[in-house]
């Protein structure tokens, strides 16, 4: 069997810059949406975006979840979800508990990846809800029925799927009832409260998080202290930050749900070796990633299910299918050296530790241009190595107090490189935490990543024109007028991607109309036409071009149209014709070659060999 010898030691990903984008997140999510379907959810209303129109709390919850399901397909297509109504007339669950209805569609497990059919039918659930499911108060004192307890039980059973090591498990609870047992007798209320809180605690002990999305009445704010504070486990500090009023409007609720669903997830787990015999566990979070279209998935033409790719190796000599593990060869001194896949993996492994501390340097040694790619945020974890948090805090405090950053070796199966570990202190405001404490891992550049800036002027040897003080003053005034306050790159969605997803959504859900996408990257014409901005622009133009900015300099136009003769580039610094005759063009730098090409209006793109050939062609050699 013939294999390419040069391919033996080739990395799976030869571009080290791509390893950031191709990191696989360590876990997926299992999510259960719990929706209160009591009559109170249908009676209570709040103002909608449209004037003179009211929306029920049930409609708000359903709309938020429908939007979240569509976002799941785009952002986290591997996540699995389930939808569960409680306080219902009908029941549908494996435990056969009253007042709980698990909504699903055929050919799908109770908790599974969201499908187009699930989203389409859930979008229409309000039209058929009263007929097929029905609303009914499920907490009845005389019968000892407790639909909230049953819903937590059913949700916990649904979340048994998957391991905590590979998945995060969450419940999202939508309700407008802040005291579900308020109308009960004291003894019954205490008993139901105790059993329900115990059921919630049992779920949390299994690693399941419960998050509340409350809906407030127009004339009454949701009081979380009556019951749900204990159910979701809020302490006094967290209670002050919890804002139940966010559920008053549909858009607020959608925004709140989006923030909770798209929480930061672990991009990778790292073992940080501080010294021999001492290592701690860190979780790495990707702070910034490019938004790209999803990868292509091949489907079976008959079942429309993803196809499973199987690969077989066939011997070219015998035609037989290779059963044994494939070995690779590397020619060495007229011999073919055999390597197994495991041996190659060990050869390419640079170090056993993932991240190893080398030393410390002053923060002044770290320059802005050293940060060439998005950094990774590191935070300690005691999940595997007990005491990691304590050691991390001691290191973090010392680095901040001494104004030092750590230099570490980041290797393993990834291309090796040096990284800078910069401690970040916690930033708080009146509304709570703005930035968490932790360490930013900055990927330091290789030596050839840092290059001198090329200074290219129209006339080599002539000083570049400098702006006057008045021009600088006018430019600063213009920038102040055009400054975007509280700017964040997250405010602007990629318009091409948004349209791409809108088209996919319309095709998958058989929608007649394409969802309108707004291009936030277009200039703000209304803002640019403000009198103060227009005045600043005109003053800047006048300072640069004078009273008549449209008049072009004749001398400038003539100078631009002139073509310099071959060999006259760089004011005689080099005789390019002579260098071409003697074959010494290769001794010039790329910048010097581009100077000749620029002077003769030739292309300057390509490698050094391409530039030399282009000069030789122009000279006629």
UniProtKB/Swiss-Prot annotation:
Changing residue 117 to K: Loss of interactions with TRP1 and KU80. Expressed ubiquitously. Residues 1-21, 545-569 are annotated as: Disordered. Induction: Up-regulated in response to induction of double-strand breaks. Down-regulated by heat shock. Its main location: nucleus. Disulfide bonds: none annotated. SUPFAM superfamilies: SAP domain, SPOC domain-like, vWA-like. Residues 273-471 form the Ku domain. GO terms for biological process: DNA recombination; DNA repair; double-strand break repair via nonhomologous end joining; response to heat; telomere maintenance. Residues 1-20 have a biased composition (Acidic residues). Disruption phenotype: No visible phenotype when grown under normal conditions. Hypersensitivity to ionising radiation (IR) and to methylmethane sulfonate (MMS). Longer telomeres. Residues 585-619 form the SAP domain. Pfam families: Ku, Ku_C, Ku_N, SAP. The keyword Zinc does not apply. It catalyses: ATP + H2O = ADP + phosphate + H(+). Its EC number is 3.6.4.12. Keywords: ATP-binding, Cytoplasm, DNA damage, DNA recombination, DNA repair, DNA-binding, Helicase, Hydrolase, Nucleotide-binding, Nucleus. It is found in: Nucleus; Cytoplasm. One of its GO terms (cellular component) is Ku70:Ku80 complex. PANTHER family: KU AUTOANTIGEN DNA HELICASE, X-RAY REPAIR CROSS-COMPLEMENTING PROTEIN 6. Belongs to the ku70 family. Single-stranded DNA-dependent ATP-dependent helicase. Involved in DNA non-homologous end joining (NHEJ) required for double-strand break repair. When associated with KU80, binds to double-stranded telomeric and non-telomeric DNA sequences, but not to single-stranded DNA. Plays a role in maintaining telomere length. Acts as a negative regulator of telomerase. Required for maintenance of the telomeric C-rich strand. This is ATP-dependent DNA helicase 2 subunit KU70. It comes from Arabidopsis thaliana (Mouse-ear cress).
């Amino acid at each position: 069997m013939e294999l390419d010898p040069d391919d033996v030691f080739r990395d799976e990903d030869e571009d080290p810059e791509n390893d950031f984008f191709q990191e696989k997140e360590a876990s997926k999510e299992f999510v259960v949406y719990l929706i209160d379907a009591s009559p109170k959810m249908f009676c209570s209303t709040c103002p909608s975006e449209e004037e003179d129109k009211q929306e029920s709390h049930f409609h708000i919850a359903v709309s938020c979840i429908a939007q979240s399901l569509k976002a799941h397909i785009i952002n986290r297509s591997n996540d699995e979800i389930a939808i569960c109504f409680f306080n219902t007339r009908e029941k549908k669950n494996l435990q056969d508990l009253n007042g709980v209805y698990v909504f699903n569609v055929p050919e799908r497990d109770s908790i599974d990846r969201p499908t187009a059919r699930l989203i389409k039918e859930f979008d229409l659930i309000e039209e058929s809800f009263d007929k097929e499911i029905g609303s009914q108060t499920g907490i009845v004192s005389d019968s000892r029925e407790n639909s909230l307890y049953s819903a937590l039980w059913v949700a916990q059973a649904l979340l048994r799927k998957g391991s905590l090591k590979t998945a995060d498990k969450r419940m999202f609870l939508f309700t407008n009832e802040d005291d579900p047992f308020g109308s009960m007798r004291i003894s019954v209320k205490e008993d139901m409260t105790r059993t329900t809180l115990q059921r919630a605690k049992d779920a949390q002990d299994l690693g399941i998080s419960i998050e509340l999305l409350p809906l407030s009445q127009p004339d009454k704010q949701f009081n979380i202290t009556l019951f749900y504070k204990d159910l979701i486990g809020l302490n006094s500090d967290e209670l002050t930050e919890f804002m139940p009023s966010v559920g008053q409007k549909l858009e607020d609720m959608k925004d709140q749900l989006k923030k909770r669903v798209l929480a930061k997830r672990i991009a990778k787990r790292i073992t940080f070796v501080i010294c021999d015999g001492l290592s701690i566990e860190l979780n790495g979070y990707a702070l910034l990633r490019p938004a790209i279209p999803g990868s292509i998935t091949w489907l079976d033409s008959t079942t429309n299910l993803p196809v499973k790719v199987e690969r077989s190796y066939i011997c070219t000599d015998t035609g037989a299918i290779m059963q044994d593990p494939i070995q690779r060869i590397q020619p060495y001194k007229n011999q073919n050296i055999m390597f197994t896949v495991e041996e190659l993996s060990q050869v390419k492994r640079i170090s056993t530790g993932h991240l190893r501390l080398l030393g410390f340097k002053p923060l002044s040694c770290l320059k802005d241009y050293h940060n060439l790619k998005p950094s990774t945020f590191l935070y300690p974890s005691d999940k595997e190595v007990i005491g990691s948090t304590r050691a991390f805090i001691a290191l973090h405090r010392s680095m901040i107090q001494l104004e030092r950053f750590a230099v570490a070796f980041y290797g393993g199966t990834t291309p090796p490189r040096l990284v800078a570990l910069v401690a970040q202190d916690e930033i708080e405001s009146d509304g709570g935490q703005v930035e968490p404490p932790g360490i930013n891992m900055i990927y330091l550049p290789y030596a050839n990543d840092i290059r001198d800036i090329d200074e290219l002027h129209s006339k080599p040897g002539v000083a570049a024109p400098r702006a006057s003080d008045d021009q600088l003053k006018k430019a600063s005034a213009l920038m102040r007028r055009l400054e975007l306050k509280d700017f964040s790159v997250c405010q602007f969605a990629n318009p091409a991607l948004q349209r791409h997803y809108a088209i996919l959504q319309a095709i998958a859900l058989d929608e007649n109309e394409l969802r309108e996408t707004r291009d936030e990257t277009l200039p703000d014409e209304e803002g640019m036409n403000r009198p103060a901005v227009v005045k600043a622009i005109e003053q800047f133009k006048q300072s640069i071009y004078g009273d008549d900015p449209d008049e072009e300099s004749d001398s400038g136009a003539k100078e631009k149209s002139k073509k310099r003769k071959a060999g006259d580039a760089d004011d005689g610094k080099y005789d390019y014709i002579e260098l071409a005759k003697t074959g010494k063009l290769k001794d010039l730098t790329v910048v010097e070659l581009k100077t000749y090409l620029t002077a003769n209006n030739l292309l300057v793109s390509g490698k050094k060999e391409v530039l030399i050939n282009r000069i030789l062609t122009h000279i006629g050699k």
